[in-house]
Amino acid sequence: MKLHQLAYVLAVAEEQHFTRAAARLHLAQPSLSRQISLLEHELGVLLFNRGPGQGLVTLTAEGEALLPFVHRVLADTEAIGAEARALTGMVRGRLSVGATPSLITRVLAPALVEFHTSHPGIELAVVEAGSRQLVGQLTSGEVDLALVVLPITDPGVDTTPLFDDPLVLAVAPDHPLAVQRRVRVADLDGLPLVMFREGYDLRAVTLAACRDADVQPRLVSQGGEMDGVLAFVAAGLGAAVVPAIAMPAESTLCAIPFTRPGLSRTVALAHRADRPVPRAARALADQLAGLRQRDLIAPPAGDRT
């Protein structure tokens, strides 16, 4: 059974005439008659009552019973084509994007607003997690695209570096270091430090920097997310190493840059290596890459004191 045969059945049923149906379909009438006969043979039933000559034809009882199914199959086929055209044209669809908490607010959010304005029919799902968890969700297909922090070693994920994100030391206004214009990693030695939870990119970056400088901070709190860490810092519990972009504009905290070469992390766009990137994801990726040129990522770290 072929789709075109079903279309022929519908045309003959509507025209009630083989010759008129053949003209409508731009077919030779014998070819149309043969296709209908082949379908009837395959189904084992006659679909049309054929009168003598080239007169009107009518559906048999079996043809009447099967015609609604013909309508349904042809309508569903057209719907499949229309939906595919809508998806490739980004009229409709779904896009799942992951990012670390600090990247959602200042990087992903403005890009998603712009994307939604351009493609309002695309449903957006946002997943907030650490880079390692996001890599797992990429490889499992749970997310299409993710903003992660390098390095990523999973061979199943391809990454494209976007920008270097400077890190600062966040302290309360009355903290002894608040008067400093810059701090050294060595200044973290013995310093009460509020630390992010295990698996958090910033925790790994901070501890690696301390090991490289042979310093040992005093961890007064561990296991927090970004909002909790900044709240503990504001309460005077300790300092925290955070991305400059994570500092709220209305924050009273002091953000002190590190002396050169400073501390930073590399933010990258990641996707599954063994699959083509969906068109909608490619469009969003282009917008995220363009954020660098439009200076929407982060203010200079030294501007927050």
Model regions and ranges:
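Short helix-boundary/capping micro-motifs
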Residues: 12-31
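Short loop->beta-strand "edge-of-pocket" segments that line small-molecule binding or catalytic clefts
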Residues: 96-98, 167-168, 176, 183-202, ...
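Hydrophobic hinge/microswitch elements
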Residues: 130-143, 148-149, 197-256
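Central regulatory/effector-binding core of bacterial HTH transcription factors
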Residues: 90-155, 216, 223
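A short LG(V/I)-centered, amphipathic sequence patch enriched
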Residues: 40-59
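Secondary-structure junction motif
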Residues: 192-213, 277-286, 292-303
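Beta-alpha-beta core module
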Residues: 155-161, 165, 180, 187, ...
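Alpha-helical linker/hinge and terminal dimerization helices associated
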Residues: 42-45, 66-88
